[in-house]
Amino acid sequence: MAEPPKLRVLMVSDFFFPNFGGVENHIYYLSQCLLKLGHKVVVMTHAYGNRSGVRYMTGGLKVYYVPWRPFVMQTTFPTVYGTLPIVRTILRREKITVVHGHQAFSTLCHEALMHARTMGYKVVFTDHSLYGFADVGSIHMNKVLQFSLADIDQAICVSHTSKENTVLRSGLSPAKVFMIPNAVDTAMFKPASVRPSTDIITIVVISRLVYRKGADLLVEVIPEVCRLYPNVRFVVGGDGPKHVRLEEMREKHSLQDRVEMLGAVPHSRVRSVLVTGHIFLNSSLTEAFCIAILEAASCGLLTVSTRVGGVPEVLPDDMVVLAEPDPDDMVRAIEKAISILPTINPEEMHNRMKKLYSWQDVAKRTEIVYDRALKCSNRSLLERLMRFLSCGAWAGKLFCMVMILDYLLWRLLQLLQPDEDIEEAPDICLCHHRGVEVSEGLRKKIK
């Protein structure tokens, strides 16, 4: 018989496979490493197209694609209480001990954390983003975050800059916030066996083509670099609203033969695109931590990036050239990168990345956060309401009303369907037997 799981963790976010991005990769790789450490991990996300219901992924990772459809930017419509029945069922079925929510943008994450705390579960939140304080959208989002984190057990941020930002936005105690960086799968992102010729210098851009990722900067930077360096070409991977602007720039400056537009690039093809280049260009206007930079560095590319958010913390100074988010400064940074390109050794850079970043290390550090969360004392409803009341003169009262109603609905659900009536799901330990994955329960029959 296999040993019972150490912890039973529910990862919750609107962002997961088959969608691709930094948050999606983080949840997937962290879950896989936690499974290898002996924990049970279940993921809850919304349905993607016809992908709905329960699915199993590599290593026995169980994913609940709940029948909620994305509303805008891959997030579900905020129902506040609509997700309570299904969250309660999953928590009981999987015998969850820790609920781990990801990303401040995720509606599903905020609602699941609220319901989990109402039911007395330990909750952890990871913030993958940076937010401002001045515009209307940021003010609204910061208030939502303050509500979600008022009753949190522990929080994780992916950089020191992100930690400071989250503490300021949410009013959370810094003692409750841990800094655990992202990582990269260095086994997947390796340099090319034969380095591309430097006769033609290829600059690679892989990013969502949106304002926040600095697509407007690319429109100004690319023509100027092409004018200064006839032997430079660009490969741009990604899609988004700003794709049209880049196409117009290419037409306007007659750069069709020097700027290749790939469109959306699946994560499985990212490495094959990266190894065709010499320099990786990141033009983000705000970034808590950029996994794309790690992937490029692991493939042996020299990075040029904007000096924003947590980006300066990601790589050593000799592996990245930083610039202000200004077209002229970025052009100067690219010129500097081209001049030091002959000194770059891709294999040496890859080996350094293997030592600097590891998902196994991220998982072990996350384990410590889970242990800290489990040691936090359970608070009564009155104590929890006092926390929400301190969130503001009007907002505090509103938050208290929301939580009281959530508590009453949970009690009503317990009357309509007692906890004992929710069937517990069996633990399935996938192991390899003659090249086939089988459940622990079938192992004896096979033998």
UniProtKB/Swiss-Prot annotation:
Phenotype of the disrupted gene, per the record: Defective in pollen germination and pollen tube growth.
Its EC number(s): 2.4.1.198
Residue spans, topological domain Cytoplasmic: 1-387
Organism lineage: Eukaryota, Viridiplantae, Streptophyta, Embryophyta, Tracheophyta
Cellular component GO terms held in the UniProt record: glycosylphosphatidylinositol-N-acetylglucosaminyltransferase (GPI-GnT) complex
Molecular function via GO: phosphatidylinositol N-acetylglucosaminyltransferase activity
Membrane-spanning parts: 388-408
Keyword field: Endoplasmic reticulum, Glycosyltransferase, GPI-anchor biosynthesis, Membrane, Transferase, Transmembrane, Transmembrane helix
Native organism: Arabidopsis thaliana
Broad enzyme group: transferase
Topological domain ranges for the Lumenal compartment: 409-447
Protein known as: Phosphatidylinositol N-acetylglucosaminyltransferase subunit A
